[in-house]
């Protein structure tokens, strides 16, 4: 196989690994925590994993001292917690 073909294969495998959902057995335990607004008074949109709905949902984050089930983007939440 040519080096171009190997690079293409490597790229496709990397893409597949990034898009493959996290299985529930591999999901970090913090994904089960409820959304935590934190102790600050800001109004920042963040995302958390909701285990009963098996998906990521938005919530208002205060800006500091929240639990780890808190993501800046929907994509980051899905990549980390969604099955």
From Swiss-Prot:
<feature type="site" description="Reactive bond for chymotrypsin">
    <location>
        <begin position="41"/>
        <end position="42"/>
    </location>
</feature>
<protein>
    <recommendedName>
        <fullName>Kunitz-type serine protease inhibitor vestiginin-5</fullName>
    </recommendedName>
</protein>
<keyword id="KW-0646">Protease inhibitor</keyword>
<feature type="disulfide bond">
    <location>
        <begin position="56"/>
        <end position="77"/>
    </location>
</feature>
<keyword id="KW-0722">Serine protease inhibitor</keyword>
<dbReference type="InterPro" id="IPR020901">
    <property type="entry name" value="Prtase_inh_Kunz-CS"/>
</dbReference>
<keyword id="KW-0732">Signal</keyword>
<keyword id="KW-1015">Disulfide bond</keyword>
<comment type="similarity">
    <text>Belongs to the venom Kunitz-type family.</text>
</comment>
<feature type="signal peptide">
    <location>
        <begin position="1"/>
        <end position="24"/>
    </location>
</feature>
<dbReference type="GO" id="GO:0004867">
    <property type="term" value="F:serine-type endopeptidase inhibitor activity"/>
</dbReference>
<keyword id="KW-0964">Secreted</keyword>
<dbReference type="Pfam" id="PF00014">
    <property type="entry name" value="Kunitz_BPTI"/>
</dbReference>
<dbReference type="InterPro" id="IPR036880">
    <property type="entry name" value="Kunitz_BPTI_sf"/>
</dbReference>
<dbReference type="InterPro" id="IPR002223">
    <property type="entry name" value="Kunitz_BPTI"/>
</dbReference>
<dbReference type="InterPro" id="IPR050098">
    <property type="entry name" value="TFPI/VKTCI-like"/>
</dbReference>
<feature type="disulfide bond">
    <location>
        <begin position="40"/>
        <end position="64"/>
    </location>
</feature>
<dbReference type="GO" id="GO:0005615">
    <property type="term" value="C:extracellular space"/>
</dbReference>
<feature type="disulfide bond">
    <location>
        <begin position="31"/>
        <end position="81"/>
    </location>
</feature>
<feature type="domain" description="BPTI/Kunitz inhibitor">
    <location>
        <begin position="31"/>
        <end position="81"/>
    </location>
</feature>
<comment type="function">
    <text>Serine protease inhibitor.</text>
</comment>
């Amino acid at each position: 196989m040519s080096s171009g073909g190997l690079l293409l294969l490597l790229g496709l495998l990397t893409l597949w690994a990034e898009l493959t959902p996290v299985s529930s057995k591999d999901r970090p335990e913090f994904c089960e925590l409820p959304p935590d607004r934190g102790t600050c008074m800001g109004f920042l949109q963040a995302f958390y994993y909701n285990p009963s709905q098996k998906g990521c949902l938005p919530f208002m984050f205060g800006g500091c001292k929240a639990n780890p089930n808190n993501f800046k983007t929907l994509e980051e939440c899905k990549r980390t917690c969604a099955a």
